Every structure is written in structure tokens, then in C-alpha cells.
Amino acid sequence: MTNIRKTHPLLKIINSSFVDLPAPSSLSSWWNFGSLLGVCLGVQILTGLFLAMHYTSDTATAFNSVTHICRDVNYGWLLRYLHANGASMFFICLYLHVGRGLYYGSYTYSETWNIGILLLFAVMATAFMGYVLPWGQMSFWGATVITNLLSAIPYIGTELVQWIWGGFSVYKATLTRFFAFHFLLPFIVAALVMVHLLFLHETGSNNPTGIPSDPDMIPFHPYYTIKDILGFLVMLTALATLVLFSPDLLGDPDNYIPANPLITPPHIKPEWYFFFAYAILRSIPNKLGGVLALVMSILILAIVPILHMSKQRSMMFRPLSQCLFWLLVAVLFTLTWIGGQPVEHPYIIIGQTASVLYFLIILFLMPMTSMVENYLLKW
């Protein structure tokens, strides 16, 4: 008798995606982050759902409802901090996942890569709107500053900002719609994840060598399921440690002050995982230029496949490109640090230098290095 998992209309989809899926035998731990992102999304949707049962999206009560969740709801503090720090884990896994794709040339699967970029934008939008919901000082001023950037768009900018705000400033209508979108977007993200996997399973996974692995495949289960479970345990342990020992480590103390439109915080900044993009935005002394640089800092990923000049797919056997890749990582760490600092000397010039380097490495140095490597290998 044929196994039910191979014949049942629903089970056979799951079977071909997670059980009998042929996978390259050489996948390293860098391939764990896709499944870790799935776990992060699940944790965020579950904790978010329970938080939404107690949260009120009204300017008069939003801040107090979050306090109520932490103080009066059974394990409400745990839900709240799992959700807040879960977002940080989500972005750590996201950036490592994208970095893995860049290093090993996974971007040559253009459909999977482009859906991934779309997912990155969707998750960033979700996280930004979630940061507004507690209605603390940084929530209010962060929302005001970031949405106001759209006013830099010629002709329609001002009307667009007022349309998003639902009035002439960030107030009740803004908070209500941000809550609605923050609730809705994760489900759209989940749908996009399925499309992402659909395209991935059309081509099969890449592997560290970048060499086609068709002759050497192994079943996903049990080899990679057990490997993924180890990844889950490591990540959930890290998340639990963060939540139980230092839940406010990655947050902003200003967000424990209720939103006040009359008092501006000394340093308005987003959550730490947006610091690199925020630093690029601030490094250009022109509003429209800054907004374009901000968008391009993520959108540049879409042209990476076009800039691939190497005859090899992966960077595994390309030491010059490896040096550039790790320089890019160092630049991103520098930008992340600068994004959290005040706008004063020497941070301004460091941020501007790092921003120029970021675009220079991706747009010029990496393709040129690839061509040099091709020449050295007489290809």
C-alpha cells in the first residue's frame, strides 16, 4: 500500500516540501536561517494575536493597555517581551539569511531572490508599524519623522503624508490604521513565504560550493529536519535568555514615557535593526536624496544578480571577493553603530564614509573584483 503522505492531496504537498524533498548533501548551518525565520514568524503571529486581545488602538488608552498587559494579564509581560525581542531575533535571522544568499550566490535564483526582497520590505513595514503601537515618545516621534519622509516626493508628497496620517498630524486615525496594517501584514508575509518556497522548490537549493548538486542529493527528512530542530533550540534559547534576563536591552528607554506631541526626545531613532538604513538616510544633507538613498540601500539587492560577473557562483573559492564581502559586513556594523548616535562630529563624517563605501562595494568593487578573479583563473 502506498504511504498516505504521498497520496493525500494536502499531505503530499507537505511531503514534497519538507519530507521527501531532495536536498544537497553539503548544506552548512548557514542554510538553517530559512526555517528559523519560519519559527520567528510563527512566534510573532502567536504572541501578536494574544497581545491584540488586550491591546486598544486609541491614543488615550494605547500606552495604558500595554502597561495593563505587562502588569495584570497572566504572563502578559512574557508575551509582550517575546513579541518585542522576537522581532529582533527575526531581523538577526533575516540579515544572516540575506548575507548567506549574497556570499554563496543564491541570488542567481532570481524569482526566489525577488520574492525575498519583497518579503524583506513587508517585514520592515510590519516592524515599523508595530513600533508605533505602544504609543510611547519614540513610537510617536519615530512615526512622525519616518512618515514625514514621504513629503520629499515631488508634487504628491504632502498629500500622501496627510493621507497616511488620516489628518494633519500623527494622531488617533494614524494609530488605528497602523494597528490594522500591523495585524494584517504578517499574514501577507506568510503567504509570500509560501510563494518564496514554491519558487525555491522549482529550482532546488543552492549549496556552499555553488556547483550543481543534482547527482548528490539526500532526503530533507530526517537529515535536515534534525539539523533545523537544533537551530530552533539554539535560537529559542537565545530568545528566552534575552526575554528573561534583559528584556529591555534592545529597546529605547524613551518609549516608557507616554507620547507627548509637545516634547521632542533629544535623539529620535527607530529600532536598532533599522539603524544602518537610518544612518544612510541621515548621511545625505538633502531630504529627497536621503529618502532615495534609504530606499536604494535595500532595493540595491534587486540588481545584485545583474552585477554578478564571476564565472563561479559561490564566493567559497574566491578569496578576493571574500575580503570585500567581510568589508561590507564591517561597513554595515559601522552604519548600525552610527545610526544610534547623535548627529554631531565625528559621527557625521563616519556615517557618510560608511554610506559611500556601502554603495561603492556593491555597485563597483564586487563586480570588478569578480572580473579580476576570472582573469587570474584565465577564464
Swiss-Prot record:
Cellular localization per UniProt: Mitochondrion inner membrane
Binding-site residues for heme b b562, renumbered to this chain: 83, 182
Domain of life of the organism encoding this protein: Eukaryota
Chief location of this protein within or outside the cell: mitochondrion
Pfam families for this protein: Cytochrom_B_C (PF00032), Cytochrome_B (PF00033)
Binding site for heme b b566: 97, 196
Cofactor(s), by name: heme b
Keywords: Electron transport, Heme, Iron, Membrane, Metal-binding, Mitochondrion, Mitochondrion inner membrane, Respiratory chain, Transmembrane, Transmembrane helix, Transport, Ubiquinone
Family label: Belongs to the cytochrome b family.
Note: Heme 1 (or BL or b562) is low-potential and absorbs at about 562 nm, and heme 2 (or BH or b566) is high-potential and absorbs at about 566 nm.
PANTHER family: CYTOCHROME B
Protein name per Swiss-Prot or TrEMBL: Cytochrome b
